[in-house]
Amino acid sequence: MNPAHLLVLPAVCVSFLGASIIPPQSLNLIQFKDMIRCTIPCERTWGEYADYGCYCGKGGSGRPVDALDRCCYVHDNCYGEAQKRNCNPYMKSYSFKCAKRTLFCYDAPGSCARFVCDCDRTAALCFGDSEYIGRHKNIDTKRHCQ
C-alpha cells in the first residue's frame, strides 16, 4: 500500500468528525434566510435581522420597538399558530420562488408547508418594506423589552 494513502484516511475521518459537531440548520431556516435575501435592500445581509429589537431573533417579549420589530412579532405569532395546528414551523420545508423581490408559495393551500411558507413570506416582505434602524440592533432587551 502506498504510504500516502495512509495519510488520506485519517484526514477524511477527522474531517467527518469535525463536521459532525457543527449543529445543522433546519431547512426551514435556510429557506427563510433565502426569502429575506430576496426582499431586503442589497446593502443588508439577512444576519443583520437577528437580534434586532425585542422580537427578531430567539424569543421575544414586550412591545416591538419599530415596524421592523413588529414584522418579527407577527412572524413569531404566526409560528405559534402553526404549532397549534400540530405543524412544526422550525422543521417544515416548503416550495417557494423569488422573482424580482416578490415571493410565491407553491404548496397546497391549507397544508402545513403552505402555512409556514406564508408566515415566512409575510415576514420577509415586511422586512423589505420596513426601515432598518441601526440602534435597534442588539438592544438591551432587559431594559427595552419588558
From Swiss-Prot:
GO molecular function, one term: calcium ion binding
This protein's GO CC annotations: extracellular region
Compartments, record wording: Secreted
Reactions the enzyme catalyzes: a 1,2-diacyl-sn-glycero-3-phosphocholine + H2O = a 1-acyl-sn-glycero-3-phosphocholine + a fatty acid + H(+)
Record-annotated active site: 75, 120
EC number(s) per entry: 3.1.1.4
Tissue: Expressed by the venom gland.
Pfam families linked to this entry: Phospholip_A2_1
GO biological process, one term: arachidonate secretion
SUPFAM superfamilies linked: Phospholipase A2, PLA2
Keywords: Calcium, Disulfide bond, Hydrolase, Lipid degradation, Lipid metabolism, Metal-binding, Neurotoxin, Presynaptic neurotoxin, Secreted, Signal, Toxin
Physiological role: Snake venom phospholipase A2 (PLA2) that inhibits neuromuscular transmission by blocking acetylcholine release from the nerve termini. PLA2 catalyzes the calcium-dependent hydrolysis of the 2-acyl groups in 3-sn-phosphoglycerides.
Oligomeric and partner information: Heterodimer with beta-bungarotoxin B chain; disulfide-linked. The A chain has phospholipase A2 activity and the B chain shows homology with the basic protease inhibitors.
Family: Belongs to the phospholipase A2 family. Group I subfamily. D49 sub-subfamily.
Official protein name in the record: Basic phospholipase A2 beta-bungarotoxin A1 chain
Top-level taxonomy: Eukaryota, Metazoa, Chordata, Craniata, Vertebrata
